[in-house]
Amino acid sequence: MVVIRLARGGSKKRPFFNIVATDSRNRRDGRFIERVGFYNPLATEGEEGLRLAQDRLAYWQGVGAQLSPTVARLVKQGAAKAAA
């Protein structure tokens, strides 16, 4: 099953997450099919904290990919921010 979830990057105490489409059996930071965005929880005012390729996200959901709970929350948050 394909899932869309966070893959941790960055250094110690400085998290950075790639939002990736991957097989559910792969490791968290292992091989992935496609990178569909990123999330930077420590972004400052001038930096972009969340970027999602909405077209690719819609494609993967259309072919049956499941969102992880955290990614679902981020998608909802990004949609609310885009609407505002």
UniProtKB/Swiss-Prot annotation:
Keywords: Ribonucleoprotein, Ribosomal protein
Domain of life: Bacteria
Gene Ontology biological process terms, A to Z: translation
Cited Pfam families: Ribosomal_S16 (PF00886)
GO CC terms in record: cytoplasm; small ribosomal subunit
Disulfide bond annotation, renumbered to this chain: none
Gene Ontology MF, one: structural constituent of ribosome
InterPro entries reported in the protein's UniProt record: Ribosomal_bS16, Ribosomal_bS16_dom_sf
Cross-referenced NCBIfam families: S16 (TIGR00002)
Protein family (similarity comment): Belongs to the bacterial ribosomal protein bS16 family.
Name of this protein: Small ribosomal subunit protein bS16
Organism: Cupriavidus necator (strain ATCC 17699 / DSM 428 / KCTC 22496 / NCIMB 10442 / H16 / Stanier 337)
Gene from which this protein is expressed: rpsP
